[in-house]
Each structure stands twice: as C-alpha cells, then as structure tokens.
From Swiss-Prot:
GO CC annotation terms, alphabetical: cytoplasm
Gene: aspS
Source organism: Burkholderia lata (strain ATCC 17760 / DSM 23089 / LMG 22485 / NCIMB 9086 / R18194 / 383)
Protein name (Swiss-Prot/TrEMBL): Aspartate--tRNA(Asp/Asn) ligase
Binding-site residues for L-aspartate, renumbered to this chain: E174, R220, H457, R498
Binding-site residues for ATP, renumbered to this chain: R220, D221, E222, Q229, E491, G543, L544, D545, R546
Pfam family, any one: GAD
A Gene Ontology biological process term: aspartyl-tRNA aminoacylation
Enzyme class: ligase
Length: 600
C-alpha cells in the first residue's frame, strides 16, 4: 500500500469498509476510557482516528504521540457510533479504526496552540511555518492559488501571452524609492528591482506581441500600511489596438469571472463609472466605498461671507473647502460620541469638528442645537438645511480647511460612522460588493516644494485627446486616459492608455521639467522604440494580494501572503534584512557609512 491513499479531510462514507493509509499531523490526542482518539489533520481537513488497546504495539505508539507529531496511520473506515457524528466536518460521519501507526517525525512542544485566535502578529510571523498550518491560513493561500488560476484561464482564453520581464532593471527614481542591487561586475553601478513591468510591457506591444500578461512580483521601498508590502504581486496586463472603454470592458469581465468562479459572487453586470472630480466632491476620495450611504454636501460658496472665521477663511482661500456630512438619525449620538469623532478627524489634519443637530427643522435656527449656530447668518443656515436635505433627528458634521484636509478627514469620518454599530443599525452601510471605475484623473499634480508638476500616475499615461494642447500651455488642466477599478473602498486595479507617439512623450517629459538630455539618459530606449511605428496600447495591473484579502475577509494582506514582511519591512522568520560580511561588501565595492546619531 502507498504511504498515503487518501487525504484526511476527504475520507467520507464512500470509503466505508475500506482500508486506507493516511498521513498528517496530530491536531489533538484524547484518551477516553482506555481508547485513544487522534484528530489527524492534513491540508484537506480532519479525520477522527480510533486507537483500540487490542493492538498493543500500535496502542503503545499512540500513547506517546503529541500535538503536531507527523504520523502515518493505516486503518479501516467505519461509521461513527450513533450520537457522535460531527456535522462540522466533511469526514464527520465516519472514523478510521487504526491498525498501524508510524511516527514519521516527532515535534517539540509548539509555542502556541493552532486554534488560538488571539496570537500577536509578531508570534505568528516569527513561527510562520506553524502559523501556516492553521486552517484559515491554509484556506487563504488556496484561495490565492484559485484566483491566480482563474485569472490565467481568462487571459489565456482572451489571447494573452504570459511573458516574463526582467527582475534586474534600470533605476528611474520617479515616485516611490527603488530597491537597489549593486553590480559586482560593473563597479559603482546599480540595478533596481522593478516597481512594475511598465516600460517592458509597453516595449512588448511595440514588438507586436499584441496581448501580454504575467503574474509578477513588484518592489517598492516605501512606508508600509495594512495593505502594503515592500514586495507585492500584480496581475499585470497590456494590450494593443483597444480604446479605453474596450480595455475597461475586457478587464471588468475578468474580475466578474474571477469572483464568480472562486467565491461564487455575482458582481454587477455593469460597473458604474465616476469621474475623479465627482468622486472627490461627493466622497472626498478617489476610491469611494459605495456601500456607505453618506455623501458630502458642498458649502464653500455659501460660507464666504459668514462671520465664523473657521468657515469663511478656508471658503475664501484658493485651495480651501467647506463641506458637510449629514448623518440621518445622528441626533442619537452622544456628546461622548461626537468628542470621539473630533479626536478621530485630528488624525487627518483637521483642527476640530463642527456639528449641528437638527431637532425641529421647521423652527429654523431655533430648532437647531449647536455651538456654531450663533455665528452663522440666516442665509447660510438656510443653505445648509436645503443643500444637505436634513430632517428632524439628523446631525450635520462640517469640515473647513485646505481641500486635502477636508477630503481626508471628512472622508475618513464618513467611513467610520458608516461602518460603526450605529451606522449598521440605521442602514447607513449596505452589505455586499460595490465596484466602480474612477476615470478622468488629473494628468499632473503640482509639487510646491520642488515648484514643478509631477505625474499623478506615471509619465507614460496618455492625456485625453482634447487636452493635448494643455501639455505646453497649462499642464494643470490636463486630464489623463487613466482608470482605477475600485471595490468596497479599495483600489484593486489601475491602468491607462499609454502614450504611443514619441513627440507626445517628449512633451510630457518637458511638462515634468525633464530635459531632453535627462530623458534620453533615463528613457532613451523607450523614446527610440516609440519611433518604430508603436501601436496604440494600454493596460492595467491588479493587486493580487488586495483582491484575495478582500475575498478572504482578512484584516491585512499579510494574512494572504505565505511569508510576508512586517510594517518595518522585516521578515521575522528568517531575520531578514541582516548584515553581510566585509568580503561580500568589498566584492561589490561598497563601504558602509554609519548613520548619524541624533544630537542630544
């Protein structure tokens, strides 16, 4: 008989009366009245093994096994006794009567129980091998595998070709910091690990491969958050001879296919499309969570002449904004709740949080409860009530500051209230999946510190045709053929139509204050390629880690990556990064300089 004939979790009634050979780990060993029960676990699940003292040698071995021992058992599949069926297990109607038990490898006492749900992340990542044995982690990584497989199936059927691009490439420091790799054979020179295969996939379109994809690692040396890692995985795609709408349709269908085939979720037949300007005006975010049924109300123009300087000063500032967020039934919120929200918005740069409770709308200002009402004239109060559509029992929150602070703080408050217990109880958040496309992004953003424009996405994104003239006259007005796919407040994919003409690419470089010599030095290979009849092309990249995190309902992408880094970009399992010896540094012509210690 083979070492293993079945997976533990797949032993069911169809094997009744048969002898099976199983391999796995001891989840739990229980001694009940002279009979030993072993819950045996493998990647497919659990099966109950019964060790009877009638087989003395086998029973003696069973007495010595402990949790996480790796064992092989051979035995007979039989029905469980009446009243002992476990409906929570696929194998819950049967058990295996053990005939032979072999310890393949003993285990030291594990540092934690695998069913402990209160482990610190440090413990989990330090002992990642054991952590990965837990059913939830097994589920997450198998889900990740299925998502990747379904993406490949769809793209293969659509004529895409899987082509690998280099991991050692040229550093082009535009945006996030590169991970640099010193070259031993070219002293003083460095490769960079790719932040994306962007330029290579464009070159593949020029090279007539028409439709490309790969599921690939990308690297960014940036500060980490719950949804960021220094190395992450993209489903990276590029296609020729398709317009923006056709590209969106193609990949919208791919995401629908993946969700249906992996978790049996039917996403909307057509994803709504929202311009960037509308998303910012209504939600303060370019990745709005449409499950939350709260929106901003614009009040900037109505607050220009009020005596309340907290409102009028930003209302009259060039980059200022005054916006309101009406919360239905929000009068139920206590002063403690409001104080908590006030402290919360300070995290996002807000100086405070003004509010008005609407007790009796018909009474006008006399029916309002707020410390700010006395500072507002009748016309401004009327504008607030009319524009917000406030009703008795509502509360209205206000943000007034630079537009970015208003958008960040009030946008975060919108999500916090919507997803709170209060929000759930009052229907302010809907369940399910709410996808959309956000389009018409600004082509450039102005960097005050460097006094120049920078690319909002990357410098290879095509401007909208009707905005080409603005590249040289008014870059700030230029909109891009860029699009992000957003799902439940997460950007899961982003892409654009690319620039395919050399003269347009050169104009974009000039708008970014990248001179001809610098452009040739950094991107000469691209500019040269665009002169050889480059086709119209565009593409998109999806964050595999983010998609799987959402599907799995995980708290962090670290829960869907086998061996992730911490928020300090460290691998606690292997203790990377780590020092290297002096000989290796000499071979790379590198001398370390100790970082300066802060002055006392």
């Amino acid at each position: 008989m083979s070492m293993r004939t079945e997976y533990c979790g797949l032993v069911t009634e169809h094997l009744l009366g048969q002898t099976v050979s199983l391999c796995g780990w001891v989840q739990r060993r229980r001694d009940h009245g002279g009979v030993i029960f072993i819950d045996l676990r493998d990647r497919e699940g659990l099966v109950q093994v019964v060790c009877d003292p009638d087989r003395a040698e086998m029973f003696a071995t069973a007495e010595g096994v402990r949790n996480e021992f790796c064992v092989q058992i051979k035995g007979l599949v039989r029905n469980r006794p009446e009243g002992t069926v476990n409906a929570g297990l696929k194998s819950g109607k049967i058990e295996v009567l053990c005939h032979e038990l072999n310890v393949l490898n003993a285990s030291v006492t594990p540092p934690f129980q695998l069913d402990d749900d209160n482990l610190s992340e440090t413990t989990r990542l330090t002992h990642r091998v054991l952590d990965l044995r837990r059913p939830q982690m097994q589920h997450n990584l198998r889900l990740r595998y299925r998502v990747a497989i379904e993406a490949r199936k769809y793209l293969d059927e659509q004529g895409f070709i899987d082509i690998e691009t280099p991991m050692l490439t040229k550093s082009t420091p535009e945006g996030a910091r590169d991970y640099l790799v010193p070259s031993r054979t070219n002293a003083g020179q460095f490769f960079a690990l790719p932040q994306s295969p962007q330029l290579f996939k464009q070159l593949l379109m020029v090279a007539n491969f028409d439709r490309y994809y790969q599921i690939t690692k990308c690297f960014r040396d940036e500060d980490l958050r719950a949804d960021r890692q220094p190395e992450f995985t993209q489903i990276d795609c590029e296609t020729s001879f398709l317009g923006e709408q056709e590209i969106r349709d193609l990949f919208e269908d791919m995401i629908r296919h993946i969700f249906k085939t992996t978790i049996d979720v039917e996403l909307d037949a057509t994803f709504p499309v929202m311009p960037y300007s509308e998303a910012m005006a209504r939600f303060g975010s370019d990745k709005p969570d449409l499950r939350v049924q709260l929106e901003f109300t614009e009040l900037t123009d109505a607050m220009k002449d009020v005596d309340f300087k907290v409102f009028s000063t930003p209302a009259n500032a060039k980059d200022g904004r005054v916006a309101a967020l009406r919360v239905p039934k929000g009068s139920e919120l206590s002063r403690g709740d409001i104080d908590g929200y006030t402290e919360f918005v300070r995290i996002y740069g807000a100086k405070g949080l003004a509010w008005i409770k609407v007790n009796e709308k018909a009474k006008g200002r006399d029916g309002l409860q707020s410390p700010i009402v006395k500072n507002l004239h009748d016309a401004s109060i009327a504008a607030i009530l009319e524009r917000t559509g406030a009703e008795d029992g509502d509360i209205i929150f206000f943000a007034a500051d630079r537009a970015k602070v208003v958008n960040d703080s009030l946008g975060a408050l919108r999500l916090k209230i919507g997803h709170s217990e209060f929000g759930k109880a009052n229907g302010l958040v809907h369940a399910g999946w709410k996808p959309l496309w956000v389009v018409d992004f600004p082509m450039f953003e102005y960097d005050d510190e460097d006094a120049r424009y920078v690319a909002a996405h990357h410098p290879f994104t095509s401007p909208k045709d009707e905005h080409l003239e603005y590249l040289e006259t008014d870059p700030g007005r230029c909109l891009a053929k860029a699009y992000d796919m957003v799902l439940n407040g997460w950007e899961i994919g982003g892409g654009s139509v690319r620039i395919h003409r050399e003269e347009v690419q050169s104009k974009v470089f000039r708008a970014l204050k990248i001179g001809a010599e610098e452009a040739q030095l950094k991107f000469g290979f691209l500019l040269d390629a665009l002169q050889y009849g480059a086709p119209p092309h565009g593409g998109i990249a999806f964050g595999l880690d983010r998609i799987v995190t959402m599907m799995a309902g995980a708290d962090s992408i670290r829960d869907v990556i086998a061996f992730p880094k911490t928020q300090r970009a460290q691998d606690l399992l292997t203790q990377a990064p780590s020092p290297v010896d002096e000989r290796q540094l000499r071979e790379l012509h590198i001398r370390l300089r100790q970082p300066e210690q802060p002055k006392a």
